[in-house]
């Protein structure tokens, strides 16, 4: 499953690998990888594979789920497809409450005591997913965990999720992606080394000259 999804993401250009010409994230971190899972929306076969995979993860790890919650905005469409497949209610959670109208942060119904699974497109530092989890907990929901399409497998993300006491499972990850990219001849040995060094410590730019 991990390598299959990784292959899909590479084929449609949802993930770019540029170890010799790094991207700069909004945080200022230089990165050899850029992930835009919104592109999956434009590929029916890919998004169907993702929805099926997320459903499988939820059934395996969070079988008592009652509500599917998407993170705004990238997780909303995937949450909708998964909730439809599972015949479950769905809501989505904003990064912060609206400044007008009812001032909702949670759109749709997620009631006190209900068991919720969060659908996220990408786990990097875990920040947006944790914000979603906290909003649902404040509303009295029991958050069973998070499922996502892809994770960078960053230690900082793992630590934040553990600190928030929330389980998280991804369809694919950085390790599988770099392995598939190497198998496809998209990166060579030198590039693979740079990618591996970056994941160990993204804040240390020594990987660029590794």
From Swiss-Prot:
Pathway: Pyrimidine metabolism; UMP biosynthesis via de novo pathway; UMP from orotate: step 1/2. It is an enzyme of class 2 (transferase). Orotate binds at residue 124. Its cofactor is Mg(2+). The keyword Signal does not apply. It comes from the Bacteria. The keyword Ribonucleoprotein does not apply. Keywords: Glycosyltransferase, Magnesium, Pyrimidine biosynthesis, Transferase. 5-phospho-alpha-D-ribose 1-diphosphate binds at residues 94, 98, 100, 120-128. InterPro entries: OPRT, Or_phspho_trans_dom, PRibTrfase_dom, PRTase-like. Pfam families: Pribosyltran (PF00156). It catalyses: orotidine 5'-phosphate + diphosphate = orotate + 5-phospho-alpha-D-ribose 1-diphosphate. SUPFAM superfamilies: PRTase-like (SSF53271). One of its GO terms (biological process) is 'de novo' UMP biosynthetic process. Catalyzes the transfer of a ribosyl phosphate group from 5-phosphoribose 1-diphosphate to orotate, leading to the formation of orotidine monophosphate (OMP). Homodimer. This is Orotate phosphoribosyltransferase. It comes from Bacillus mycoides (strain KBAB4) (Bacillus weihenstephanensis).
């Amino acid at each position: 499953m991990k390598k299959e999804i990784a292959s899909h993401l590479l084929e449609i250009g949802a993930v770019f690998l540029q170890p010799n010409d790094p991207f700069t994230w909004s945080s200022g971190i230089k990165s050899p990888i850029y992930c835009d899972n919104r592109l999956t929306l434009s590929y029916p076969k890919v998004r169907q594979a993702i929805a099926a995979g997320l459903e499988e993860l939820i059934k395996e790890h969070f079988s008592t789920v009652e509500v599917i919650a998407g993170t705004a905005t990238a997780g909303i469409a995937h949450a909708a497809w998964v909730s439809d497949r599972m015949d479950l209610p769905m809501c989505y959670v904003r990064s912060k409450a609206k400044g007008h109208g009812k001032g909702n942060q949670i759109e749709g119904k997620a009631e006190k005591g209900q068991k919720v699974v969060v659908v996220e497109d990408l786990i990097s530092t875990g920040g947006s997913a944790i914000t979603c989890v906290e909003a649902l907990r404040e509303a009295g929901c029991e958050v069973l965990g998070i499922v996502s399409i892809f994770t960078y497998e960053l230690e900082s993300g793992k630590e934040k999720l553990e600190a928030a006491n929330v389980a998280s499972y991804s369809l694919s990850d950085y390790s599988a992606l770099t392995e598939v990219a190497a198998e496809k001849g998209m990166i060579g040995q030198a590039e693979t080394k740079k990618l591996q060094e970056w994941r160990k410590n993204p804040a240390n730019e020594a990987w660029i000259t590794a």
